[in-house]
Amino acid sequence: MGLGGPLSSATSFASKTLEGAMSDSMAESAVAQAAKMKIDTQNSILDGKMDSATKEINSGHNAAKAIQF
């Protein structure tokens, strides 16, 4: 038998398996975080547009109220 034999092979296999799982997990997490950042940015832009539209509508209403006949 070689140095360590089956135990050494099992340990090496387990270590490589865990390294692969951690690598996959980190990659999936990075992809999910990038997608969330993109969605958060889009939502922030849309919120700003909605706020501007609301201010414009309110300004129009206030101007209409100020007109006296």
Curated annotation (Swiss-Prot):
Disulfide bonds: none
Localisation: Secreted; Fimbrium
Top-level lineage group: Bacteria
GO cellular component term of the entry, any: extracellular region
Record's keyword annotation contains Secreted: yes
Keyword annotations of the record: Fimbrium, Secreted, Virulence
Annotated family: Belongs to the HrpA type 2 family.
Described function: Major structure protein of the hrp pilus, which is a component of the type III secretion system (T3SS, Hrp secretion system) required for effector protein delivery, parasitism, and pathogenicity. The hrp pilus functions as a conduit for protein delivery into the host cell.
Name of the protein: Hrp pili protein HrpA
Organism whose genome encodes this protein: Pantoea stewartii subsp. stewartii
